[in-house]
Amino acid sequence: MKGGRRGQVPVKQNQHRLNGEIRGVREVRLTGADGESVGIVSIQEALATAEESGLDLVEISPNAEPPVCRVMDYGKFLFEKSKATKEQKKKQKQIQIKELKFRPGTDVGDYQVKLRNLIRFLEEGNKVKVTIRFRGREMAHQDIGVDVLNRLKEDTDEFAVVESFPTKIEARQMIMVLAPKKK
């Protein structure tokens, strides 16, 4: 069979050396299970201390001179670490940019529906890109498009801050970006 390990997930290596894996050193700076510094001891003494307490000897800082080791429950340490990273991921929120398209002749009912959606997007914490599209002869009435944008700006004043307001028309459209107000 050709190939090799196709489709298999690579095995993740431990970031820390444990117990018998700590080789090539005679002395280590030992930290006890409760966090207090024991001092510089031989590797055998450190392993014996870890074994007596029923915990693991974990090499925390291998590049230090002498290497720093700590007596701890390694499984619990990894669990706490993964729990902390999950908490950080929960706190991060991806900001999306939602887009709403209007026309210069957008009717009052349609305007109200789109305004409701725009306010909902802002309350969810998303930015909103408002586009006014011009077709055919509507290009002659760009002032109506600016009026629609100004009306939107006034209607969303308590929810949003205008990030960018169009100064000129580009590719038959005007674009305004609204960002949610900080609470």
Swiss-Prot record:
Recorded GO MF terms: ribosome binding; translation initiation factor activity
SUPFAM superfamilies: Translation initiation factor IF3, C-terminal domain (SSF55200), Translation initiation factor IF3, N-terminal domain (SSF54364)
InterPro entries from the UniProt entry: T_IF-3_C_sf, T_IF-3_N_sf, Translation_initiation_fac3_CS, Translation_initiation_fac_3, Translation_initiation_fac_3_C, Translation_initiation_fac_3_N
GO cellular component: cytosol
Superkingdom of source: Bacteria
Keywords: Cytoplasm, Initiation factor, Protein biosynthesis
Main location: cytoplasm
One GO term (biological process): ribosome disassembly
One of the Pfam families matching this protein, by short name: IF3_C
Localization per record: Cytoplasm
Physiological role: IF-3 binds to the 30S ribosomal subunit and shifts the equilibrium between 70S ribosomes and their 50S and 30S subunits in favor of the free subunits, thus enhancing the availability of 30S subunits on which protein synthesis initiation begins.
NCBIfam families: infC
Subunit structure: Monomer.
Stated family: Belongs to the IF-3 family.
Protein name, as recorded: Translation initiation factor IF-3
Protein's gene: infC
